[in-house]
Amino acid sequence: MLKRKPSNASDKEKHQKPKRSSSFGNFDRFRNNSVSKSDDSIEVHDRELTNGSEEQSKTSSSGGSLGKKVRAISWTMKKKVGKKYIKALSEEKEEESGEEALPYRNSDPMIGTHTEKISLKASDSMDSLYSGQSSSSGITSCSDGTSNRDSFRLDDDSPYSGPFCGRAKVHTDFTPSPYDTDSLKIKKGDIIDIICKTPMGMWTGMLNNKVGNFKFIYVDVILEEEAAPKKIKVPRSRRRENHQTIQEFLERIHLQEYTSTLLLNGYETLDDLKDIKESHLIELNIADPEDRARLLSAAESLLDEETTVEHEKESVPLSSNPDILSASQLEDCPRDSGCYISSENSDNGKEDLESENLSDMVQKIAITESSD
């Protein structure tokens, strides 16, 4: 065993006093002890601070790594959601074209109930996917998007039957983005019924019982030809069988030298010659009385031909009494106090006799000229 060295404190004299190093006695000793104790406490505090800073740095580094992990997970989920939605749209198109869609896998983590929400930051692409349903705080699940498409299908089942403002023919093919559900897929040659025209150039129309938007630059407006108004044929009361010109008519009666005179004074058709009188011929400086007589007789013959044609076309039978004229003829004849006048006593009968005499005279004159 180790032996303890004996202390020499007992060897000192009891009456011997301790030596003072200063005038303050043992004060310096207590001061040195207090200083050493305070130094020790400072060192301990510094150690605690360093340990705390190390722990904080460890916790901060662990928190930063956790934030990176969360961001990586959110980015991965965004990509998965986008791929899933594109796949759903492609399968929907296949169903519309009659092909069978591929079933979803049971292991797909994106298929869930309507209550599942993913607290991720919304991106611009996802905003366009759900057309305003996603917010900055979160994005709805794919099941919500499919329910929205189902509602669109219900709207498509009831086609638009309202008024249209025109039709347009497509001259350029256009296939909208799969995210754009409001635009029409158009092909060259399609006929679109226009519902609304906006000044921005995006029109609304219906194609194959589907209402949607399309740009006016892809179509040509069809101008509907207005139905031509039906021509109302007015029955002419005066119609002749032989359609001749004044020149031919005057050549037939050997008076072609008066063609220019008559044309310059407004006698352009044969109808104008029917009402000509001898005073009119004198005003036209036709001085030869024989020429005037021949022209008047020819005009009267035209009038007689027209009256015979009208009589043939009349469907109203005459009365049993041949002496009494029809009502239409009586309107043209002068009458006194409403009394009917027979054809024997009328002025028309006298004019007919005079016309016959004039025609005989014209024939005699023509015979004499030919004999000469």
UniProtKB/Swiss-Prot annotation:
Record-listed Phosphotyrosine modification sites: 160
Biased composition regions of type Polar residues, renumbered to the chain: 317-329
One GO cellular component term noted in the UniProt record for this chain: nucleus
Disulfide bond sites: none
Domain SAM per the UniProt entry, residue ranges: 241-305
Tissue: Detected in spleen and lymph node (at protein level).
SUPFAM superfamilies for the chain: SAM/Pointed domain, SH3-domain
Compositionally biased region (Low complexity): 52-63, 129-146
GO molecular function, one term: phosphotyrosine residue binding
Biased composition range(s): Basic and acidic residues: 37-49
Span of domain SH3: 163-224
Modified residues (Phosphothreonine): 76
Pfam families on file: SAM_2, SH3_2, SPIDER
Subunit structure: Interacts with FASLG. Interacts with phosphotyrosine containing proteins. Interacts (via SH3 domain) with CTTN. Interacts (phosphorylated at Ser-23) with YWHAB, YWHAE, YWHAG, YWHAH, YWHAZ and SFN. Interacts directly with SAP30 and HDAC1. Identified in a complex with SAP30 and HDAC1.
Protein name: SAM domain-containing protein SAMSN-1
Gene symbol of the encoding locus: Samsn1
